[in-house]
């Protein structure tokens, strides 16, 4: 039986792929203003990309903004993400602070999911996963390659590793250098879908070349896609209303 990851009233892994929209404001005001505007859109989940937040090194300010953000979003599930620069993020932070930030946020129980980067190391990933689960927070274990698309076997290997580390939602995003790279990502996604049917996964091929991967998740096996409300947080993101329309057409004709 396929594993459904439920956050609030949203069931990730069931039916049509869910749409997540990132918030990338630099100040608390910008973040909360973005959240207000998102209420007008048809979306399922919001991701706070805290690496864009100028006060990210002040945990108390992070918690304060987080509290206000969850109040504004109300019943919309929230992903908390600090994306390191090497994986396409806005800035880099020391690994010790990355760990502390994620653990402290998990303990607030104000977020529904935390995104943890696979390559921070197994022990740190396990520690964050354990604390998050103890506080009823789900975990996305992720990997982003903004330079290339690894071979099919490597993509599959990374997704399996995320499953073995007890991630609720393994996620991989890769950069295609040609059309075949996009097919490689889709092939790997489909293979994991069939070999590990009990696990929901998130995959995407970035840039305009990889756009098919953002809309065809229901066919190949990716349960969540990212759309842009304003500023895209990754290359190739589609406007959320357009994304909704395309996903609906595909869903109704599969």
Curated annotation (Swiss-Prot):
<dbReference type="GO" id="GO:0009423">
    <property type="term" value="P:chorismate biosynthetic process"/>
</dbReference>
<dbReference type="GO" id="GO:0008652">
    <property type="term" value="P:amino acid biosynthetic process"/>
</dbReference>
<comment type="function">
    <text>Involved in the third step of the chorismate pathway, which leads to the biosynthesis of aromatic amino acids. Catalyzes the cis-dehydration of 3-dehydroquinate (DHQ) and introduces the first double bond of the aromatic ring to yield 3-dehydroshikimate.</text>
</comment>
<dbReference type="GO" id="GO:0046279">
    <property type="term" value="P:3,4-dihydroxybenzoate biosynthetic process"/>
</dbReference>
<protein>
    <recommendedName>
        <fullName>3-dehydroquinate dehydratase</fullName>
        <ecNumber>4.2.1.10</ecNumber>
    </recommendedName>
</protein>
<dbReference type="InterPro" id="IPR018508">
    <property type="entry name" value="3-dehydroquinate_DH_AS"/>
</dbReference>
<dbReference type="Pfam" id="PF01487">
    <property type="entry name" value="DHquinase_I"/>
</dbReference>
<keyword id="KW-0028">Amino-acid biosynthesis</keyword>
<comment type="subunit">
    <text>Homodimer.</text>
</comment>
<dbReference type="GO" id="GO:0009073">
    <property type="term" value="P:aromatic amino acid family biosynthetic process"/>
</dbReference>
<feature type="binding site">
    <location>
        <begin position="47"/>
        <end position="49"/>
    </location>
    <ligand>
        <name>3-dehydroquinate</name>
    </ligand>
</feature>
<dbReference type="InterPro" id="IPR001381">
    <property type="entry name" value="DHquinase_I"/>
</dbReference>
<feature type="binding site">
    <location>
        <position position="237"/>
    </location>
    <ligand>
        <name>3-dehydroquinate</name>
    </ligand>
</feature>
<dbReference type="InterPro" id="IPR050146">
    <property type="entry name" value="Type-I_3-dehydroquinase"/>
</dbReference>
<dbReference type="GO" id="GO:0003855">
    <property type="term" value="F:3-dehydroquinate dehydratase activity"/>
</dbReference>
<feature type="active site" description="Schiff-base intermediate with substrate">
    <location>
        <position position="171"/>
    </location>
</feature>
<dbReference type="InterPro" id="IPR013785">
    <property type="entry name" value="Aldolase_TIM"/>
</dbReference>
<keyword id="KW-0456">Lyase</keyword>
<keyword id="KW-0057">Aromatic amino acid biosynthesis</keyword>
<comment type="similarity">
    <text>Belongs to the type-I 3-dehydroquinase family.</text>
</comment>
<comment type="pathway">
    <text>Metabolic intermediate biosynthesis; chorismate biosynthesis; chorismate from D-erythrose 4-phosphate and phosphoenolpyruvate: step 3/7.</text>
</comment>
<keyword id="KW-0704">Schiff base</keyword>
<feature type="binding site">
    <location>
        <position position="83"/>
    </location>
    <ligand>
        <name>3-dehydroquinate</name>
    </ligand>
</feature>
<feature type="binding site">
    <location>
        <position position="233"/>
    </location>
    <ligand>
        <name>3-dehydroquinate</name>
    </ligand>
</feature>
<feature type="binding site">
    <location>
        <position position="214"/>
    </location>
    <ligand>
        <name>3-dehydroquinate</name>
    </ligand>
</feature>
<feature type="active site" description="Proton donor/acceptor">
    <location>
        <position position="144"/>
    </location>
</feature>
């Amino acid at each position: 039986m396929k594993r459904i990851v439920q956050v609030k009233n949203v069931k990730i892994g069931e039916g049509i792929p869910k749409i997540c929209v990132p918030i990338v404001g630099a100040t608390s005001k910008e973040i909360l203003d973005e959240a207000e505007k998102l209420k007008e859109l048809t979306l399922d989940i919001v991701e706070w990309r805290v690496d864009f937040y100028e006060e990210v090194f002040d945990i108390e300010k992070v918690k304060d903004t987080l509290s206000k953000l969850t109040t504004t979003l109300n019943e919309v599930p929230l992903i908390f993400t600090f994306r390191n620069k090497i994986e396409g993020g806005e800035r880099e932070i020391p690994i010790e602070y990355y760990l502390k930030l994620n653990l402290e946020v998990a303990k607030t129980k104000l977020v529904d999911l935390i995104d943890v980067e696979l390559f921070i190391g197994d022990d740190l990933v396990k520690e964050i996963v354990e604390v998050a689960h103890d506080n009823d927070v789900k975990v996305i274990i992720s990997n982003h390659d903004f330079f290339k698309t690894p071979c099919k076997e490597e993509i599959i290997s990374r997704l399996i590793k995320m499953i073995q580390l007890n991630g609720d939602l393994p996620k991989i995003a890769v950069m295609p250098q040609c059309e075949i790279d996009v097919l490689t990502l889709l092939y790997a996604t489909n293979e994991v879908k069939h070999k590990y049917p009990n696990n929901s996964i998130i995959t995407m091929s970035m840039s305009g070349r990889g756009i098919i991967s953002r809309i065809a998740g229901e066919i190949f096996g990716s349960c969540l896609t990212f759309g842009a409300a304003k500023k895209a947080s990754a290359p190739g993101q589609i406007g959320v209303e357009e994304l909704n329309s395309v996903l609906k057409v595909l869903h109704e004709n599969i």
